[in-house]
């Protein structure tokens, strides 16, 4: 989103990435710092040789320590900003999640704490699925029974599958994405980025400057992309262009 680049300027460490083609060479490894129990943060700036540069924030959530929730918008409207959705939590990191239809209703399956929030499962879409403290990204068709999972949110397209960048439609837009594997979920927000360049950054090995995502899913982007961090050592408010139906909210463990 358009506010991310300006907001990132005051942070001290940037990851500068450059390279060519599928074998991109990243200048620095990601510099994640623990900002709360179970939550680590890094900022990045990516400069593809054949596309527009982009920058943003990544948060690694350790589900063995921190809690991840899918929280719906409240009040008379079916949509709120992520800042409004996260307002009840004194300490949290939150990003937008589900795509939504013309009536503002979340598209795809949406489940939080085992409670069904949206039932329109999209078989061909990807889905972040959390069972206990284990997170993975699967196809909607691979979810026969939503009731056995603690959290589900669907998105499209799957950017990275099994460590491989997928064939993706070219598009330049602000990005919100999630990576998942085992007990680690990574939330990523970015300024305008071309789809494949963004996916290559997500999949790139950490030692060459990527995030090392084995599986990554695109969530709603464009004006929906927004981020809020309310932590004792880090405060961010990166607003989008409109309200959204829900948000992924990471809640740090109490000290």
Annotate each PLM feature.
Residues 100-168:
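Active-site-adjacent helix-turn-beta-strand microarchitecture at beta-sheet edges
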Residues 103-122, 168-180, 184-218, 224-255:
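Conserved, well-ordered active-site substructure
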């Amino acid at each position: 989103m358009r506010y991310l680049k300006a907001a990132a300027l005051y942070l001290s460490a940037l990851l500068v990435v450059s390279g060519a083609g599928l074998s991109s060479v990243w200048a620095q490894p990601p510099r994640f710092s623990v900002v709360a129990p179970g939550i680590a943060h890094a900022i990045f700036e990516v400069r593809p040789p054949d596309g527009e540069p982009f920058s943003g924030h990544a948060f690694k959530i350790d589900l063995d320590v921190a809690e991840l929730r899918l929280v719906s918008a409240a009040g008379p409207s079916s949509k709120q900003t992520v800042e409004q959705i996260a307002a009840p939590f004194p300490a949290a990191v939150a990003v937008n999640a589900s795509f939504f239809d013309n009536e503002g209703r979340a598209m795809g399956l949406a489940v939080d704490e085992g409670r069904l929030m949206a039932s329109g499962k999209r078989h061909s879409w990807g889905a972040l699925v959390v069972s206990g403290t284990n997170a993975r990204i699967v196809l909607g068709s691979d979810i026969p029974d939503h009731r056995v999972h603690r959290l589900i949110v669907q998105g499209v397209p799957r950017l990275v599958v099994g460590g491989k960048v997928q064939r993706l439609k070219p598009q330049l837009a602000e990005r919100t994405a999630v990576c998942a594997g085992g007990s680690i979920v990574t939330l990523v927000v970015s300024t305008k980025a071309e789809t494949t360049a963004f996916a290559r950054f997500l999949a790139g090995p950490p030692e060459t400057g990527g995030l090392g995502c084995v599986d990554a899913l695109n969530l709603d982007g464009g004006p929906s992309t927004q981020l809020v961090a309310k932590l004792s050592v880090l405060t961010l408010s990166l607003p989008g262009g409109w309200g959204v139906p829900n948000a992924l909210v990471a809640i740090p463990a109490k000290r």
